[in-house]
Each structure stands twice: as C-alpha cells, then as structure tokens.
Amino acid sequence: DGVTASLSHLTDPTAFMPHGITGFFAGFQIAIFSFTGIELLGTMTAETRDPQRILPKAINALPLRIIIFYLLSMVVIIAVASWPGVSAETSPFVTLFAKAGLPAAAAVINFVALTSAMSSANSGVFSSTRMLYGLSVEKHAHWQFRILSRNTRIPVRSLLFSCFCMLIGTLLLFLVPNVMTLFTIVSTLAAIMVVFSWGMILVAYLVYRRQRPDLHAGSIFKMPAGVVMSWVSLLFFAFAIFIMIFDPDTLLALLASPLWFIALWGFWKLKQRREGQLTLDNQSA
C-alpha cells in the first residue's frame, strides 16, 4: 500500500500520533482497560506457599514484561505499518504480518489473540469468583456464595454466578449492534471501575502509612516514594476520567457509571436494614 517500514514513523507526527495530542490522551481509557486485573498479581502471589519470596520477584519482573510485550510490540507495529495503516476492525498484529507478506503468521497471531482474550476472561472470572467468595465469608454477600465443592474445594456457586453475569454481557450486542461502539462503551465502564478499585487501593495504602507506620517499617518489600507516587497516580486517574467527557461513547459510559454505585449503595443500605432487624429480633427473643 506504499508504506515503507521505517523507525522514522516513531518521530513522524502523522504516523505516531495521527490525531494529535488529543488522540494520545484519548488512548488512556483503552490503556487502563488493557491493564485490568494487574492488581491480581498481589492477590494471587499472596496465596502461594512463599509469598515473601515470590511477590517481590513477580512484581520486579512486571515492568520488563510490559516493555517487551507491550511497548516494543507497539514500536514494531508503528515502524512497519504506522498508525494510519492499522484498522480498528482488525488486530494490529494481524495487519502487521499481512503487510509483511506472511498471511500464515497473521492467522497464527489471530489465534493467539483469541486465546489471550480467553485468558483475560478467565482472569475476570477468577477475580469476581474470589471476590464473591470473600464477601460471603465476611457476611457481605449471600451465604450460598461461600459454599465449596466437595472434591475441588472451589466456590462453585460464586463461579456459576460470575459466568452467568459474563454471559449476560453478550446480550448487549442486541442493544448496540455496532461492535466497536459497544466495545468502547463496555471498556470505558470497565476502565472507570478499575480506576475506582485502584484508587481505593492507593487510598487504603495512604491510610495504612499514616495509621500503622510500625507495620510499614517492618515490611521487607517497600514501594520507593510510595506516598508521593500514590498521589501522582491518583492525579493521573482523575485526569484519565476527565478526558472521557470529550468523546460521545466514553461520555455515555461515564454518565452511566454512577448508576452502578447507586445500586451498590442501595444494596448496602438494604443489608444494613436487614441486619438491624435481625438484631432487634434477637434482642426481643
């Protein structure tokens, strides 16, 4: 198609940022969505036999993997195809190998992309299942969600409920026939929820640093400049939410997101009311 592979695409504004700085900022939403579940690294390694050894090793290896599999892959895509040559309807890796004259490799990469999507879905099911189980154990969710299977000791009912909720998501295709529009809306909603979760983690860390400095002093794996970087991250999250108002699809998701928090607040108040009624019944008995 006349595009010559060259590293000069990295410095050419029309190839590197064809939509200018506003397009670059608009990409923050999908970038946040792409790293959804990264917080599970601490959750899963904490459940291993030797978390004090495995957790630092896993976290220290993460930046290098992001550079290799995310940043360098983007460099290769831009160098070969440039952004204007990559269609939003096709995987950029498929486009890359197709332009290089390797259609078989493009098919393989397409298969890898599908398996990656399945892996991402599996991580989502794992996290939601574990969260439901934990909430049930703490008596913040229905007691049936903490029932374990006899053989595998897996919270089966939490797992089935998570899968059911994921299946409901496919019905959205009937409400929004355009796949890319639907993907933008859903990914934006997910990014907003992720920003909220990450923000709460950072706030909890700041409170922990202020209220329990003794525990932090005894930690063997401290975050360098943890307090400063927490505030920087919170400011970045606020900016990422702010720029969502400039795109119609992301704005729609942003306006709809309060409904989820209102629903959670309603369920919480209902739970408190039931607990209060049970307390009164027990006292009267």
Regions found by a protein language model. Give the residues of each.
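TM-loop-TM module centered on a large, flexible mid-protein loop between adjacent transmembrane helices
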Residues: 11-14, 58-122, 141-190
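Membrane-helix boundary/coupling elements in multi-pass transport proteins
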Residues: 30, 35-48, 106-143, 187-192, ...
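Inter-helical loop and helix-membrane interface segments of multi-pass membrane transporters/permeases
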Residues: 2-24, 177-182, 248
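C-terminal membrane-solvent junction of multi-pass transporters and transport-like membrane proteins
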Residues: 144-152, 195-247, 278, 282-285
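Structural signal for membrane-spanning alpha-helices in multi-pass inner-membrane proteins
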Residues: 74-78, 166-174, 202-209, 240-244, ...
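Transmembrane helix-loop boundary segments of multi-pass membrane transporters
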Residues: 91-94, 108, 171-201, 217-220, ...
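Hydrophobic alpha-helical segments and their helix-loop junctions in multi-pass secondary transporters
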Residues: 1-13, 32, 74-81, 198-215, ...
